[in-house]
């Protein structure tokens, strides 16, 4: 079944329409009335796009003691709506225990030149189960489940497990980073789904030097992809053991790939000050070779760019550890998520253990300048703006509005790690809050009028992780 057949079978009569986000009056003609595909032609055009009115958030019950399936929460983020700052819909997955984690779209701005494509389907994998859910957002306020790819199929056709990052490709396929083989062993690889959401096999042809896998981002104009390393699922799934770091069971490398040849061409070993490199972000400008990666355990930010035919990688930010009386070692900040604003001016990242979110001016990528900082819980117990609420856990996943003015934050990292470092979260649930960003001068402030308490969900307290907008965002759209 090809793309058009899938669209027709999923929603009769809607295959020719294109979903452009909650501000576009539903299923309608494109914003430019031209024969274009989803998303935007450029980052500048994206910044001028409609303001987000809905936010999709994965919520999970793994590790909470609640015997219920994970679900996709639809949150109203339109301040003019009577249901503002509320969960307005919950789509439950069919099976308990998936651990929904990261997710992405079937199409984004990389497919903008293809008028046959629509940004309509969310690909939502289970990190623990390796089950992949295809969710139809034809009704943006009431998504439905369109298809489920069972783990046995993924194991049999690709010998992969533990799906993580989801990116659409310009040819209509979807690529997912996989952290293990069918038995949960490193290094994993990259899974391809075709345009009918069938398993098409593996993407990579040559992965020599890759010991682990995690995140990836590609920049097609420069024929390059960058990937990072966490650990094997058999290592991280039960929680964090510092001895595993000393034993070499966690990554400290990033890999540069030839995008067309699908093989590694350069590996940068970040050493002891680059342990556990997680999220990778290129500039949104497709002509740029600049990008960043956050090394979680070392609490450092690394900048890369191409100099001639070589890739240069340098450490540009380092967050010192903090001393706590009840900890046997200095507490690292633990940088767990980062993103770049659509205009490539600001870098944001979260320090999950310390509890702060930081904003840096990166107009000079080699010399980031701190311009804003807010506290959102964390182990250091610093004062935060929502003083009437005790924020359990630390800031983790981030999502920024296309215009760069609103930063949304959730606090769950991974269920077993949550239970290890923030055991109260299993009973309190997660938060979703909004930080208002000054894009002219720098600076941030928590918005006290927006707060979603996932501790009050109908089936019990839930954990909230990654977020997406129907109209595209700063971590899913890649410009070709």
Each predicted region: which residue ranges?
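N-terminal export signals
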Residues: 5-27
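Structural signature of eukaryotic scaffold interfaces centered on beta-propeller domains
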Residues: 34-51, 102-118, 162-170, 217-221, ...
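Beta-propeller domains
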Residues: 58-98, 115, 124-148, 206-213, 217-360
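Short, conserved, GDST-rich strand-edge loop motifs in beta-rich repeat architectures
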Residues: 58-66, 116-119, 177-186, 230-249, ...
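Short loop/turn segments immediately following beta-strands, especially the blade-tip
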Residues: 75-82, 135-143, 303-314, 360-371, ...
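Surface-exposed loop and turn segments in beta-propeller and other repeat-based domains
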Residues: 88-101, 148-158, 204-209, 266-273, ...
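Asp-box/WD-like beta-propeller blade repeats and closely related beta-sheet repeat scaffolds
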Residues: 138-217
């Amino acid at each position: 079944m090809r793309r058009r057949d899938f669209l027709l079978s999923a929603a009769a009569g809607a295959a020719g329409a294109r979903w452009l986000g909650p501000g576009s009056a539903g299923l309608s003609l494109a914003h430019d009335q031209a024969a274009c595909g989803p998303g935007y032609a450029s980052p500048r055009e994206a910044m001028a796009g409609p303001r987000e009115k809905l936010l999709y958030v994965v919520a999970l019950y793994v590790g909470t003691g609640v015997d219920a399936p994970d679900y996709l929460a639809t949150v109203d983020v339109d301040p003019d709506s009577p249901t503002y700052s509320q969960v307005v819909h919950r789509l439950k997955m069919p099976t308990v225990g998936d651990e929904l984690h990261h997710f992405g779209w079937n199409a984004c701005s990389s497919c903008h030149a293809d008028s046959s494509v629509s940004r309509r389907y969310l690909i939502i994998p289970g990190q623990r189960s390796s089950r992949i859910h295809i969710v139809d957002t034809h009704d943006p306020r009431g998504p439905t489940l369109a298809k489920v790819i069972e783990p046995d199929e993924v194991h049999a056709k690709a010998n992969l497990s533990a799906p993580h990052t989801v990116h659409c490709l310009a040819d209509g396929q979807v690529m997912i980073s996989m952290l293990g083989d069918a038995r949960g062993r490193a290094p994993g690889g990259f899974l391809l789904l075709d345009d009918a959401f069938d398993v098409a096999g593996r993407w990579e042809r040559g992965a020599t030097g890759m010991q682990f896998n995690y995140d990836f981002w590609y920049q097609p104009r420069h024929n390059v992809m960058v990937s990072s390393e966490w650990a094997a699922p058999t290592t991280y799934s039960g929680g964090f053991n510092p001895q595993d770091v000393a034993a070499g069971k966690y990554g400290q490398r990033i890999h540069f790939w030839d995008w067309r040849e699908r093989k590694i061409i350069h590996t940068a070993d970040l050493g002891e000050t680059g342990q556990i490199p997680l999220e990778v972000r290129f500039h949104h400008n497709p002509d740029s070779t600049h990008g960043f990666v956050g090394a979680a355990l070392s609490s450092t930010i690394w900048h890369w760019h191409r100099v001639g035919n070589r890739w240069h990688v340098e450490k540009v930010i380092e967050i010192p550890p903090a001393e706590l009386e009840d900890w046997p070692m200095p507490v690292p900040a633990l940088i767990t998520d980062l993103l770049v604003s659509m205009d490539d001016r600001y870098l944001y990242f979260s320090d999950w253990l310390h509890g702060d979110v930081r904003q840096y001016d990166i107009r000079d990528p080699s010399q980031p300048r701190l311009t804003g900082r807010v506290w959102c819980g964390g182990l250091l117990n610093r004062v935060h703006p929502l003083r009437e609420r005790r924020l359990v856990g630390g800031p983790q996943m981030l999502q920024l509005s296309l215009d760069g003015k609103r930063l949304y934050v959730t606090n769950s990292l991974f269920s077993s790690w949550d239970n290890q470092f923030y055991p109260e979260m299993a009973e309190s649930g997660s938060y979703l809050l909004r930080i208002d960003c000054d894009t002219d001068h720098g600076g941030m402030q928590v918005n006290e009028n927006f707060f979603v308490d996932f501790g009050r969900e109908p089936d019990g307290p839930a954990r909230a992780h990654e977020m997406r907008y129907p109209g595209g965002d700063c971590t899913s759209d890649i410009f070709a």
